[in-house]
């Protein structure tokens, strides 16, 4: 009987909390992040272990480039649900952004944790595409002396190829573009277009022509082809 009474006493609060969450989520999707943050913070005061609320607050902090706050939210998520791959991926992402934008000497000490977070995401979810993209970016951006490796980037690109052909071609093209193998990158981006016809594939090829190969007319034609295809 007591449990029934407690349930009916708590029911209005539960409905209110869900209503507020829905409002916060709607504001987030509308990119009204400051307003959404206020709502999610109020929810967190009464429900400090609500995973989705914490994740939204982490996402908002990341968009605001408040790296320490975002790190704190994602770290809490890892503690509350240690087998969720995406929390490790997001944690590694904001930790990496803090490293890039902060003290370079401190950044060196963060590299292993960034890499380890992405690797953990893949270990928990072997089909995690975004974590592989993040590792590719990490390995091509880092100097060799602190762990950068083109061959390791290619390894993760090969893994992407098995999971998603378009991601495989785009990632290989990205690696080729980074190392100034523009003709090879062009081939990969064209393969991505052929199998997916995605906006991203067309945009990558157009950007390559315009920004790296000094062929603005080719870039224009690529974007026009995409526009005509969608029209």
Describe each PLM feature range.
Residues 27, 61, 95, 102, ...:
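Residue at a conserved register position within TPR or TPR-like alpha-solenoid repeats
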Residues 47, 81, 118, 125, ...:
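A structural motif in tetratricopeptide-repeat
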Residues 30, 64, 98, 142, ...:
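Structural motif corresponding to the intra-repeat A-B loop/turn of tetratricopeptide repeats
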């Amino acid at each position: 009987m007591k449990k029934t009474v407690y349930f009916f006493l708590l029911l209005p609060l539960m409905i209110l909390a869900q209503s507020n969450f829905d409002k916060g989520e709607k504001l987030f999707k509308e990119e009204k992040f400051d307003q959404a943050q206020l709502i999610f913070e109020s929810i967190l005061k009464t429900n400090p272990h609500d995973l989705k609320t914490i994740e939204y607050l982490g996402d908002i902090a990341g968009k605001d480039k408040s790296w320490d706050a975002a790190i704190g939210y994602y770290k809490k998520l890892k503690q509350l649900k240690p087998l969720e791959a995406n929390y490790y991926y997001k944690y590694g992402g904001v930790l990496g952004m803090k490293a890039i934008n902060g003290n370079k000497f401190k950044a060196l000490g963060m590299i292993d944790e960034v890499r380890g977070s992405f690797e953990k995401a893949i270990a928990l979810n072997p089909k995690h595409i975004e974590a592989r993209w993040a590792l590719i970016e990490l390995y091509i951006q880092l100097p060799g002396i602190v762990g950068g490796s083109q061959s390791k980037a290619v390894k993760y690109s090969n893994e992407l190829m098995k999971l998603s052909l378009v991601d495989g071609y785009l990632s290989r093209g990205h690696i080729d573009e980074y190392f100034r193998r523009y003709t090879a990158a062009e081939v990969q981006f064209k393969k991505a277009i052929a199998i997916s016809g995605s906006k991203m594939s067309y945009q990558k090829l157009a950007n390559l022509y315009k920004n790296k190969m000094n062929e603005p007319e080719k870039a224009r034609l690529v974007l026009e082809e995409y526009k005509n295809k969608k029209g």
